[in-house]
């Protein structure tokens, strides 16, 4: 399944009945959020608002509102197939030396595929069909959503921010929300450890007092967007990874005003800079936690130039109490994470990030336990192996007889296999999500691990319980006579 740009993907979804065009006039101020939220919670389609009130540019919402659509965006026909994406990333993250000539020959196609997916630079691009500069730059013409009643203003929610540090050849792609505060000014809310913020900091050290070039793509193709939120190895660019997902090289074009390369097929490109010391208070905004975040200062992105396709489409979303679109993305990307973790920790059977836990704040791990204390090693591994889990506050580790995705199973294991004093691990003064107001200090808090595995000799002095299970022969006999008993059971049984 191939698509070249966002419009191809929209056509694919529409052909499958997975996109609904809304012709009625809908206000980007609050109304779109309510419609998208109801649709997402019901597992409904992507929405194309063709007549946003006060604007001439259509708005695409709820694009990744189901795990199945995320899988399609990553070039896969099913959510389960995302495990294959994870296996590829696991291999690229830590490739094993070939065990012999035959093994090297078998791995050669993978390396060739990766090497052949470097982005293709083009001289002419749809994203630069229309060029607006000077006084013509006016962000007020974009139907930017105001998502919640207490929001400080309109918020750009799907920006693909392109930066490059002074000592780096490859660019960084990141998604950082941006508050509109003027016709050509947006607050860039990137946290200090994110790639864009690190590039900015290094640039300031290398070129003190000089403006930092930035480009922002709006409405890039799904593979490129999803590549920016996937744990891509540092040796692989997000553009190359997007090409692997898409099955075709990512086409990029150089910006008109700087040397950054942006997706050639994007609907909009914003070119500009961040001036040293230009900061503004950002927020409050309703966030993926289900609360409004506190106000804090972040750099201001000054837009010098807007380029866009003819008849452009504005891609947007909202964040709120799960489930929201980031939570759905988390459910799908969960399948990508599993093989990556299993590469480092083969004892892991399953790994689950419950969407109710804001996609990353809680993790449940099932494992094949091999020695006393093994669960604690896995806890530490989850917190340290991938930077995506540095903010995970709660890690629950159970044996592989427990279904990590069934709370009834997990709670049973926790209440029957845990002693709170012996089987919890508390780690203080660790990195915590800036948005987590429950932590005593902004960005710094504690983590806790729960060992809900069966305890081995050395971990307990008591005789351990044996789980109850019916004999299989009895179950088979009852299966054979069940229909004749005439007992009607609910389908959920």
Swiss-Prot record:
One of its GO terms (cellular component) is cytosol. Its cofactor is prenylated FMN; Mn(2+). It catalyses: a 4-hydroxy-3-(all-trans-polyprenyl)benzoate + H(+) = a 2-(all-trans-polyprenyl)phenol + CO2. The keyword Cell cycle does not apply. It comes from Cellvibrio japonicus (strain Ueda107) (Pseudomonas fluorescens subsp. cellulosa). This is 3-octaprenyl-4-hydroxybenzoate carboxy-lyase. It holds the Pfam family UbiD_C. Belongs to the UbiD family. It is found in: Cell membrane. The gene is ubiD.
């Amino acid at each position: 399944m191939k698509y070249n740009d966002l419009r191809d993907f929209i056509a694919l979804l529409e052909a499958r009945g997975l996109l609904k065009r809304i012709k009625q006039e809908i206000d980007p101020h609050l109304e779109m959020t309510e419609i998208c939220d109801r649709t997402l919670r019901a597992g409904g389609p992507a929405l194309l608002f063709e007549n946003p009130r006060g604007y001439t540019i259509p708005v695409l919402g709820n694009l990744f509102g189901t795990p199945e659509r995320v899988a399609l965006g990553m070039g896969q026909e099913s959510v389960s197939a995302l495990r294959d994406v994870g296996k590829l990333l696991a291999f690229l993250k830590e490739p094993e030396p070939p065990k012999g000539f035959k093994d090297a020959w078998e791995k050669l196609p993978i390396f060739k595929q990766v090497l052949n997916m470097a982005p293709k630079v083009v001289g002419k691009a749809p994203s630069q069909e229309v060029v607006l500069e000077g006084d013509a730059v006016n962000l007020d013409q974009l139907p930017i959503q105001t998502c919640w009643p207490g929001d400080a203003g309109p918020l750009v929610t799907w920006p693909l921010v392109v930066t490059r540090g002074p000592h780096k050849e490859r660019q960084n792609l990141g998604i950082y929300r941006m508050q509109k505060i003027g016709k050509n000014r947006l607050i860039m809310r990137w946290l200090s450890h994110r790639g864009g913020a690190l590039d900015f900091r290094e640039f300031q050290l290398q070129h003190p007092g000089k403006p930092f070039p930035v480009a922002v793509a709006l409405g890039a193709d799904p593979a490129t967007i999803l590549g920016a939120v996937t744990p891509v190895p540092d040796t692989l660019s997000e553009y190359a990874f997007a090409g692997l997902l898409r099955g075709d090289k990512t086409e990029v074009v150089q910006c008109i005003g700087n040397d950054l390369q942006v997706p050639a097929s994007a609907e909009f490109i914003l070119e500009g800079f961040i001036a040293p010391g230009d900061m503004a208070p950002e927020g409050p905004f309703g966030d993926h936690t289900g609360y409004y975040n506190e106000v804090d200062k972040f750099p201001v992105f000054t837009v010098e130039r807007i380029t866009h396709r003819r008849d452009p489409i504005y891609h947007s979303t909202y964040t709120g109490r799960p489930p929201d679109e980031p939570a759905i993305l988390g459910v799908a990307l969960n399948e990508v994470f599993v093989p990556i973790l299993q590469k480092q920790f083969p004892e892991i059977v399953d790994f689950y990030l419950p969407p109710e836990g804001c996609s990353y704040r809680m993790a449940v791990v099932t494992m094949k336990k091999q020695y006393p204390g093994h669960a604690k090693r896995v806890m530490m591994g989850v917190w340290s192996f991938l930077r995506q889990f540095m903010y995970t506050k709660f890690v629950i580790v159970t044996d592989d007889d427990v279904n990590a995705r069934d709370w009834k199973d997990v709670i049973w294991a926790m209440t029957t296999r845990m002693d709170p004093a012996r089987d919890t691990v508390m780690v203080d003064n660790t990195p915590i999500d800036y948005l987590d107001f429950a932590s005593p200090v902004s960005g710094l808090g504690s983590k806790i691990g729960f060992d809900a595995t069966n305890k081995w000799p050395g971990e307990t002095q008591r005789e351990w319980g044996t789980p109850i299970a019916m004999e299989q022969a009895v179950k088979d006999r009852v299966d054979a006579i069940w229909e004749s008993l005439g007992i009607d059971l609910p389908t959920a049984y």
